[in-house]
Amino acid sequence: VMPWGWNPAIRKRMLKGGVLEKNLPTPDALDKYRMKAARSNALAFRALFYFNKIDYTCGDGCCLVEADGRMTDISPDIVDRYKEGCVFKSLWSGSGKGLCWCRHGFTKNVSDWCSRALKENRGFVMEPIFDKVEDFAMEFYSDGRGKLLFVGYSRFVTDDKGAYRGNILTSDEQVEEWIQQYVPFEAFVRIRNMMQKALETSYATSYMGFLGVDMMVCRQKEGHPYAINPHVEINLRMNMGIVSHVLSDHFIVPGGEGRFSIDCFPTHEALMERHEQDMQSYPLV
């Protein structure tokens, strides 16, 4: 059984629907999964890339703020970086949700958000606002028995608050060509290989299923003009990147591009009307 993601409510619903308990994760396993899915786990990967000084990468200056007020620093210049603004991230949320942007000082709204996060989750992640150019992700699959496989890339779009807005449907070869306008291909492959090895060490025997690592291309004030932040977020579940990768493989002609997004409509009739319009305007063949 492989739902989009696991939580106690999904487990309960499946039991009620007749799925045998032996085919479902135990409550203890779900607790462990929840901890592995927390945003704070990306800090270990940040430290790995930072201390190994992997070329053409960025993303240092992040920390975990815990309920007792302690901060786990990743970079000594964290305070200076935060002068240009920072973003606070809930330990558990998805699709760009659970973010609090602090661009104009520590206002009451920001303070209230932090207080709620500490009360509800005992902590949150704090990081600088990076000068992002574009978003993308690397997708993997863990078999739960020690093997973690690279599935492919995905490119996606977010709004100015970091919320997910859709995917660009394109091939892996096109992504590798696209990324070379920012970093050398050899550096990109090194980043991918190091991430795959680190993920295999962390998850290959304790998690089975798809996982995606959100990354972004950032402008640099010093050194290389552009660098990759390779550990923005680790999505320990099925995700839109996997879906868009499958759609691209099956429905986009070689060398072509498409868009994948989710729209909401007030009625079934409105949805059907839009669907028929799109079928005529953007036929698959």
Segments predicted by a language model, with ranges:
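ATP-grasp fold ATP-binding core
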Residues: 64-65, 79-101, 119-132, 213, ...
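A long amphipathic alpha-helix within ATP-dependent nucleotide-binding catalytic cores
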Residues: 164-226, 265-284
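ATP-dependent carboxylate/phosphate-activation module, predominantly the ATP-grasp catalytic core
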Residues: 140-197, 235-263
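Phosphate-binding site of ATP-dependent enzymes
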Residues: 110-165, 216-231, 235, 239
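Glycine-rich phosphate-binding loop of ATP-grasp-fold ATP-dependent ligases
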Residues: 85-111, 137, 160-179
